[in-house]
Amino acid sequence: MIIVTGGAGFIGSNIVKALNDEGYKDILVVDNLKDGTKFINLADLDIADYMDKEEFIASILAGDDFGDIDAIFHEGACSSTTEWDGKYMMDNNYQYSKELLHYCLERRTPFLYASSAATYGGRTDNFIEERQYEKPLNVYGYSKFLFDQYVREILPQADSQICGFRYFNVYGPREGHKGSMASVAFHLNNQINQRQNPKLFAGSEGFQRDFIYVGDAAAVNLWFWKNGVSGIYNCGTGRAESFQAVADAVVECHKDKSLTVEHIDFPEHLKGRYQRFTQADLTKLRAAGYDKPFKTVAEGVTEYMHWLNQDK
């Protein structure tokens, strides 16, 4: 059996899809479906069982036996960069992850987990998986950073796989439940379908991020699991592209020459807490042996727009 926490969420459900595509169906999805809309992410996928997150944590703490577990992909977390309840964030992202890690270590079960590029904070270069380059801007980034630090202490003594992925700006299918935290491409597509011009923050041509297509992020997870590689790795494309490039790709897919991108004022509450530039350094990822290419914004957004608008 393979366990995917956060399996009804964005990246988690795409990992389930990638596993299905390779013939794996004996999958236990762990999630919190209080937001019932997330079920749609699983509706076309094959899983063996579902378990509520709170029940799962209780079972982990009790040391319950789940049988033969081939791997745990731990994607379950609060991923909101605008959530400032530190106790909630640390319970969800730090404490829960520690408990699950030790459960895996005791059983020598491969443990692959979601870290984040938010660990790097507001820097504009050297996005390298080393302590001197890390200084998160928000409590979400701090919760991910602290767990990475915890893993670093354990890795030298671990005799089973522990692998963390610092996701950069992930976008693509199955993110619709994320609301305001969904990708720019998702929101621009919605605006156009509502007969509006797509809107970007003023200065967006100067904001550059490393946008990675979710299918590529899932492929990284599966490759590392199959190859048994441990460590903490950036999961991005190694290319920074502008929000304007995302908007241009979305508009291009809609084939409507009347569309023009509007620029709106930058929100006050995000000033000083917003990464203006991200670009994954892939040196460590490539050195580990991962050599597959990553989609450009134009390629990934085109595939995503076809998926989003397939029923229209």
From Swiss-Prot:
The gene is hldD. Pathway: Nucleotide-sugar biosynthesis; ADP-L-glycero-beta-D-manno-heptose biosynthesis; ADP-L-glycero-beta-D-manno-heptose from D-glycero-beta-D-manno-heptose 7-phosphate: step 4/4; Bacterial outer membrane biogenesis; LPS core biosynthesis. It comes from Photorhabdus laumondii subsp. laumondii (strain DSM 15139 / CIP 105565 / TT01). The keyword NADP applies. Catalyzes the interconversion between ADP-D-glycero-beta-D-manno-heptose and ADP-L-glycero-beta-D-manno-heptose via an epimerization at carbon 6 of the heptose. It catalyses: ADP-D-glycero-beta-D-manno-heptose = ADP-L-glycero-beta-D-manno-heptose. GO terms for biological process: ADP-L-glycero-beta-D-manno-heptose biosynthetic process; lipopolysaccharide core region biosynthetic process. NADP(+) binds at residues 10-11, 31-32, 38, 53, 75-79, 92, 144, 170, 178. Contains a large N-terminal NADP-binding domain, and a smaller C-terminal substrate-binding domain. InterPro entries: Epimerase_deHydtase, Heptose_epim, NAD(P)-bd_dom_sf. This is ADP-L-glycero-D-manno-heptose-6-epimerase.
